[in-house]
C-alpha cells in the first residue's frame, strides 16, 4: 500500500498526498488566504483537514510500527508540503481554518518533530493547536459542553503530545 501511495505522491510532485475531491483547487484557495470554514466544512469540501490527518496518521504509524523508511520519507514530504501551504497565512487565518474538523493534526506534527528531530514540525504542531479549545483548558475552564467530543478529543491528545 505504501508503495502505491508513494506513486501518487511522486506524481503530485510537491509532496501532496490526499484524496479530497478537487483538493488542489481547495488547497490553492487556502494558500491564498481564501478560507471558508465551518464545523465540518472547509472551502465547500467535507472535512478535508480530517481527511488529510488520516493520511498523516497512517504514514506516521507505518513509520513507527514497521520502520518503513519509505513511509517516513513520504510523511516528511507531506509535512513539508503543509508548511509551504500555510507559510503566508496569519495565525488568525490558521485558527479560522481549524474551526473545521481537523482530527489530531497537532499530534501528528508533534510526532513528525519527534521522529525527525526537526523543530519546524513542532512549530507546525503549535500552529495547528486549536486555541478556542486550548486556552480555556489552560485556565482550567470547562468550555466543552455542547461540543462534539469526537472532534475535541484528538485536539486534546495533540496538546498532550506537544507537551511531552
List where the protein language model places each region.
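Glycan-recognition and catalytic cores of secretory/periplasmic carbohydrate-active enzymes
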Residues: 1-164
